Swiss-Prot record:
The keyword Ion transport does not apply. The keyword Zinc applies. A zinc finger (unnamed) spans 3-34. The gene is nrdR. Binds 1 zinc ion. HAMAP family: NrdR. This is Transcriptional repressor NrdR. Negatively regulates transcription of bacterial ribonucleotide reductase nrd genes and operons by binding to NrdR-boxes. Residues 49-139 form the ATP-cone domain. It comes from the Bacteria. It comes from Desulfatibacillum aliphaticivorans.
């Protein structure tokens, strides 16, 4: 580490402790050249989570974009924003825990679809109509038939 006083790079660590944030380490150092002390902070570099879109474009995961889509689907439904926000936080954690730096968008979309299916069928169909790019009324009918079949099986 370069000494802020004399510019030398040789130093020794006198003290290390966890910073106020759990992902930061605070180190007290002493320059071996001028004997002055200084503090440094180490933090793990955040690796951006990249989503691979259908057309091959890559985009950094944006929880706000997911939130906006889910809120649109859940509009005028009895689903709290808190539930949506918790889901998005968990989704991002789950995606990061895979260890993959890049995740296909369909993996994110399907996770959202599964959560909405669990929460509210109307919100699910609304989201599905955009996510699956429904073009005709028959697309809605097919999805509704699927939901009815799931309900008859005892899925909901």
């Amino acid at each position: 580490m370069k000494c802020p006083y004399c510019g030398e790079t040789e130093d020794k660590v006198i003290d290390s402790r966890q910073g106020k944030e759990a992902d930061v380490i605070r180190r007290r150092r002493e320059c071996l050249s001028c004997s002055r002390r200084f503090t440094t902070y180490e933090k793990v570099e955040d690796m951006p989570l990249v989503i691979i879109k259908k057309d091959g474009r890559r985009e950094v995961f944006n929880g706000e974009k997911v939130r906006a889509g889910m809120l649109r689907a859940c509009e005028k439904r009895n689903i709290s924003v808190h539930v949506i926000d918790e889901f998005i936080e968990q989704l991002e954690r789950d995606l990061r825990e895979t260890g993959e730096k890049e995740v296909p968008s369909h993996q994110v979309g399907e996770a959202i679809m599964n959560k909405l299916h669990e929460l509210d069928d109307v919100a699910y169909v609304r989201f599905a109509s955009v996510y699956r790019e429904f073009k005709h009324v028959n697309d809605f009918i097919s999805e509704l038939k699927y939901l009815l079949k799931q309900q008859q099986k005892g899925g909901k």
